[in-house]
């Protein structure tokens, strides 16, 4: 029901009106990927049982990786997978400190990421000045080829518009007008780290394929026989992606790994610090549009990205991680079908040894 001067509802009652209930329900269905309410209730009841109590108190590990983190953490993961790219989180320093420490603890490698250092004044008046100064400082200090921007709760609650802010920052001379600054809105109070990974990856592809926020013409797809591969939000990426690359090479498949953080989180101890290492190049991202198909691991890590790629005319094959013989067989057979290449004897030999 619309507000008017004669009948102004308090927020507690306003948000109970039918139009708001419908809006919240649609948001939950389309953006939060929520499970059914009866399932939520079942789990809630289970947490009150003796079984859950015993399971909860039986933990022995001092440190447990969270099963669910917030969107910007996933966005940082996605940004790290591109060559010479600096993740830039529009929000407070404390949030970014958490993302860096989380990844560094897990991979035992330093993780580079910066923030726009929003504080109380930015929370009230908006973070445009923080974006202007932050982009300029990031480019000057760390010399990335690309800065991938995401957001935290603070920026999203006040409604900061990344597209507008980045264009204003370029107008102010923070970075050159032609400099690549892909972005994605990643509100931490919706979804999880896999949602943020999905949003950020789609944001980077959209930036290059759809005309860099309207500043250049959109790319026209010219199909070829290449195969793209997206591994999803993978905590074992430093071992899994090199194996995927080996399989592509053994089969003679001409392919592109879209988002490859396997090197930056697996640098050698040789006395040299590498802020950037490996990753998908900008040219590879551009050429990925023309690929015949894209193979995706972890369906729920890339719901929006997979849909976007399919809308561009590519075949998208979504698989679970190929754990075990059956899963690996499915991956290899799909790769063979898409590429027209036979499965090599070396891989058949490895399979035989495993079965034996």
Curated annotation (Swiss-Prot):
As its record notes, the protein acts as a catalyst of:
N2 + 8 reduced [2Fe-2S]-[ferredoxin] + 16 ATP + 16 H2O = H2 + 8 oxidized [2Fe-2S]-[ferredoxin] + 2 NH4(+) + 16 ADP + 16 phosphate + 6 H(+)
**Superkingdom, taxonomy of origin:** Bacteria
Q: Which GO terms describe its molecular function?
A: ATP binding; iron-sulfur cluster binding; metal ion binding; nitrogenase activity
Tell me the leader sequence span.
Answer: none
**Which Enzyme Commission number(s) are listed?**
1.18.6.1
For whether the record's keyword set contains Metal-binding, the answer is yes
The subunit field of the Swiss-Prot or TrEMBL record says:
Tetramer of two alpha and two beta chains. Forms complex with the iron protein (nitrogenase component 2).
Which NCBIfam families does the UniProt entry name for this protein? nifK (TIGR01286)
Q: What is this protein called?
A: Nitrogenase molybdenum-iron protein beta chain
The protein's organism comes out as Herbaspirillum seropedicae
């Amino acid at each position: 029901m619309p507000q008017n001067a004669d009948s102004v509802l308090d927020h507690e009652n306003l948000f109970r009106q039918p139009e708001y209930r419908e809006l919240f329900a649609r948001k939950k269905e389309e953006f939060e990927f929520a499970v059914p309410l009866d399932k939520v209730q079942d789990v809630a009841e289970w947490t009150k049982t003796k079984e859950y109590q015993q399971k909860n108190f039986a933990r022995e590990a001092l440190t447990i990786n969270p099963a669910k983190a917030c969107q910007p953490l996933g966005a940082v993961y996605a940004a790290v997978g591109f060559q010479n790219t600096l993740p830039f989180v529009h929000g407070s320093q404390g949030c970014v400190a958490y993302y860096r420490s989380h990844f560094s603890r897990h991979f035992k490698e330093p993780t580079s990421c910066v923030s726009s250092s929003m504080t109380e004044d930015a929370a009230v008046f908006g973070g445009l000045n923080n974006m202007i100064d932050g982009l300029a400082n990031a480019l000057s200090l760390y010399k990335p080829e690309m800065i991938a921007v995401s957001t935290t709760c603070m920026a999203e609650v006040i409604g900061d518009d990344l597209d507008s802010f980045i264009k204003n920052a370029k107008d102010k001379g923070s970075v050159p007008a032609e400099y690549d600054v892909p972005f994605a809105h990643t509100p931490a109070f919706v979804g999880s780290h896999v949602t943020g990974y999905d949003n950020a990856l789609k944001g980077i592809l959209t930036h290059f394929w759809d005309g860099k926020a309207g500043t250049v013409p959109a790319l026209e797809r010219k199909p070829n026989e290449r195969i793209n591969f997206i591994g999803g939000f993978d905590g074992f990426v430093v071992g899994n992606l090199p194996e995927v690359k080996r399989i592509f090479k053994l089969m003679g498949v001409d392919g592109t790994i879209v988002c490859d953080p396997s090197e930056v989180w697996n640098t050698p101890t040789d006395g040299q610090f590498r802020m950037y290492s490996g990753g998908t190049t900008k040219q590879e991202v551009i050429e990925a549009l023309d690929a015949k198909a894209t193979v995706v691991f972890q369906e729920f890590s890339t719901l929006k990205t997979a849909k976007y790629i399919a809308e561009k005319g590519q075949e998208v094959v979504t698989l679970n991680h190929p754990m075990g013989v059956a899963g690996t067989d499915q991956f290899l057979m799909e790769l063979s079908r898409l590429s027209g290449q036979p499965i090599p004897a070396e891989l058949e030999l490895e399979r035989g040894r495993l079965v034996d």
